[in-house]
């Protein structure tokens, strides 16, 4: 499933219009995202948003933060490399992740 279809399906399950959901998602400056921007996200015409907006979408749509980051193809800031990880540790983490997905 694409990022857009995941948020669209979750929004519909919550019986929210695009306008209602957009009004609940605030940019870093405190203003709401536009319904058109949300529409573009749902139709995969825009790249998934930043962590600030992803966290809010997860909360409003009752999706786990981890799942939403996964379908967005990104990592939360707390998982981004600090530059001290060895290539072996990173590879081991990805192998563990793949094993968990196959269960």
Question: What is the predicted function of each stretch?
Answer:
Residues 1-16, 23:
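A short, Lys/Arg-rich alpha-helix, primarily the initiator
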